[in-house]
Amino acid sequence: MLVSQSANHSINSLSRFGMSSHLNGIGNIVPMVVEQSGMGERAFDIYSRLLRERIIFLGTPIDDAVANTIVAQLLFLDAEDSEKDIQLYINSPGGSVYAGMAIYDTIQQIRPDVVTICFGLAASMGAFLLTAGTKGKRMSLPDSRIMIHQPLGGAQGQAIDIEIQAREILYIKAQLNQLLANHTGQPLERIEADTDRDFFMSAEEAKNYGLIDQVISRQNLPTAGENVTIVK
């Protein structure tokens, strides 16, 4: 799902299903990891500990705050070591087009290869970021679902404001379709037809489509901190 909101307008591409993001209560409890060293004990939240292994999790709808966090982590890992792979795990129904494009452009600009791994669901902008990983290093667990579609839009206000938003959503639709065609190798005409409505795929179907390069299991799961061999 892609969502972009201004004061009076929104461009949506979020998956319209029974999914929720728990921001309060037990759903937001972050486990802590305690490490022993010569200096004593040191506690990390689990995501910071995984970041040390060059693993980033995108497990929520995508908004500006999420994008800022993901981009900051990508830039940090790029500065730390430009030759080691970064692993980006994705379980997301999508979200803001503009926030998602901030993550996308960062993935394309940083020096390390970005290994993208779908677990659960990669829908809309989540699927777009999945296929934006380094060619040959885009993966999915076998029972994951991947969905692509066109952005959804709504506008209110004066006629000229609605016209401006209509032009913007058509521009975004064309841009995303062209980038999907570039990353998947599919003809633009097929991308346009398939994204006209929600288009769901299994992991194997996404591989055949060109969204990912391999379906992984325990035997070939990427190892933290190690570079992944490109699948051709």
From Swiss-Prot:
Subcellular location, record wording: Cytoplasm
Question: Does this entry carry the keyword Cytoplasm?
Answer: yes
Q: Name one GO molecular function term.
A: ATPase binding
Question: Main site of residence?
Answer: cytoplasm
Alphabetically ordered keywords of this record: Cytoplasm, Hydrolase, Protease, Serine protease
Q: Pfam families under this entry?
A: CLP_protease
List, alphabetically, the NCBIfam families matched.
clpP, PRK00277.1, PRK12553.1
Function field: Cleaves peptides in various proteins in a process that requires ATP hydrolysis. Has a chymotrypsin-like activity. Plays a major role in the degradation of misfolded proteins.
The protein, known as? ATP-dependent Clp protease proteolytic subunit 2
As recorded in Swiss-Prot or TrEMBL, the protein's gene is named clpP2
